[in-house]
């Protein structure tokens, strides 16, 4: 939550005015400039919802001075949030899941890599059950550490520049790589485009913008 000059002066470049919503646009999920004090309950409810849902991230609420001084006669916290332009996806695509299972059945050297997204969706138990059922070795990014117990016989350690030889070698040797809740960032994979040549890459992430961003994906 940030402070702003009086609403009537926004955009006139007065003393201490800053276009904070514009400046923060590249690193927040959403920005609000509060125009009326009566909108504060709705905006705060929406801001918390956007920040915590889907892929979590910061939401900026900019409050002009006159709005800060105004009185909200009846503060009513909205029961529901209805945002037409923000609909995070949680359910998997059945057709794509079938492709994943078909690729897994044909694979001889599969590997499952878990990222921080598995923790955020509290999916560690599902990952563990899936790996055990199909006997798939598991590695993790730094943010994914803990999705599998470190002493589990299927766990091969952390991937990346700060990871172990076994985990990094497992990706090189695999013919099927399942990335769950990981961004494929440079700290985990230095050259993903080259690394995944000749492999089937499955990328699972709640944020569609991350899928295929850093490497060509076979099954999104």
Model-found features: residue ranges?
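N-terminal alpha/beta PP-like core and its mobile active-site loop of ThDP/TPP-dependent enzymes
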Residues: 1-220
């Amino acid at each position: 939550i940030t402070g702003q000059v009086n609403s009537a002066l926004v955009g006139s470049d007065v003393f201490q005015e800053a276009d904070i919503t514009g400046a923060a646009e590249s690193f927040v999920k959403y920005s609000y400039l509060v125009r009326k004090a009566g909108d504060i309950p709705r905006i705060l409810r929406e801001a918390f919802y956007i920040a915590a849902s889907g892929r979590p991230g910061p939401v900026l609420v900019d409050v002009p001075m006159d709005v800060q001084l105004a009185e909200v006669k009846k503060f009513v916290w909205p029961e529901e949030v209805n945002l037409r332009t923000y609909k995070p996806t949680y359910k998997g695509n059945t057709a794509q899941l079938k492709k994943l299972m078909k690729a897994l059945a044909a694979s001889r050297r599969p590997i499952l890599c878990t990222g921080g997204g598995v923790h955020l969706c509290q999916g560690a138990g599902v990952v563990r059950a899936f790996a055990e059922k199909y006997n798939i070795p598991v590695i993790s990014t730094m943010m994914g550490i803990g999705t599998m117990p470190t002493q589990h016989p299927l766990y091969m350690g952390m991937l990346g520049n700060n990871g172990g030889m076994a985990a990094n070698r497992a990706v090189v040797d695999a013919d099927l790589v399942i990335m769950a809740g990981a961004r494929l960032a440079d700290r985990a994979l230095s050259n993903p485009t080259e690394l995944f040549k000749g492999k089937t890459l499955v990328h699972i992430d709640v944020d569609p913008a991350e899928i295929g961003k850093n490497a060509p994906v076979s099954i999104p």
